[in-house]
């Protein structure tokens, strides 16, 4: 099961076995399930086994072997994928110990390079209200830490993608869209916000314009992607308003490369503005066009 080639055979072999033979085989490898789960190759057949468990006895053997080793698995590069498969393929009622561990250690897991894949998978599920509320309350309490963290920001992105009440989380960051757009990891989350909901896109545009420093986002290593996305997604009056304000700020960029870059970005949209628009006149005068 740890051979790069024979592990493929084992996966196919297990799928083809009848239930009695599966149970016999699982009992034979029961004491090696954890070791295999932590192995670069062995993790794959264990994931296949979990995916194709089809009766109570099979589940009981595997769950019994794994139950006391969740921390060891979930923080491991390979074991975390076994836990992810458990969450995807086994009913919550059969693995309450796993959900309890996640609830009690959510922040540590969300901020871990390996465990975050498990958390993302969990957030995509239709969680019961108890688990949903536990996670939601943790995120509300530590909202800033999550959005700025290299792993934790994926929690916010997953909530926005999969949860019905995603706006409750987005509104935690309202009035901070400008500053968050300048941050390496948070800027990705802000992009997700404005992609998800047109109301948030409009809030974002209003906020960055009100700041009077839209040029800071335009020249930001991270923020420039957010405002480009906003220009692409916005419509009608909001697009015109955003393009107008970006155009009149272009001379604040100073750097010639940035100015040329933003000229090419804004040009197609500038042409859509009214002929007597101050932004259009400023833009044309600045570039002598």
Region spans (language model):
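Eukaryotic gene-expression regulator signature that favors modular helical reader/repeat domains
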Residues: 1-289
């Amino acid at each position: 099961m740890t051979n790069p080639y024979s592990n493929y055979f084992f996966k196919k072999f297990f799928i083809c076995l009848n239930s009695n033979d599966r149970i016999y085989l699982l009992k034979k490898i029961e004491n090696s399930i954890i070791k295999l789960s932590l192995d670069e190759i062995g993790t794959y057949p264990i994931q296949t086994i979990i995916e194709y468990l089809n009766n109570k006895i099979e589940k009981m053997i595997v769950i019994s072997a794994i139950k006391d080793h969740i921390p060891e698995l979930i923080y491991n590069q390979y074991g975390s994928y076994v836990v992810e498969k458990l969450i995807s393929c086994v009913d919550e009622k059969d693995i309450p110990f796993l959900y309890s561990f996640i609830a009690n250690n959510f922040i540590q897991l969300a901020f871990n390079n390996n465990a975050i894949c498990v958390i993302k998978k969990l957030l995509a599920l239709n969680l019961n209200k108890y688990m949903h509320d536990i996670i939601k309350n943790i995120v509300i309490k530590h909202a800033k830490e999550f959005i700025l963290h290299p792993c934790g920001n994926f929690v916010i992105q997953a909530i926005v993608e999969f949860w019905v009440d995603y706006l409750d989380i987005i509104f935690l960051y309202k009035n901070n869209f400008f500053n968050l757009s300048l941050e390496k990891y948070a800027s990705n989350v802000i992009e997700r916000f404005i992609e998800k909901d047109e109301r948030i896109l409009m809030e974002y545009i209003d906020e960055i314009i009100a700041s009077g420093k839209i040029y800071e986002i335009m020249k930001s290593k991270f923020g420039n992607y957010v405002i480009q996305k906003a220009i692409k997604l916005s419509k009608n009056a909001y697009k015109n308003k955003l393009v107008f304000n970006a155009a009149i700020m272009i001379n604040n960029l100073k750097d010639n490369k940035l100015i040329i870059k933003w000229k090419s970005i804004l040009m197609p949209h500038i042409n859509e503005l009214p002929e007597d628009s101050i932004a259009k006149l400023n833009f044309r005068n600045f570039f002598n066009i």
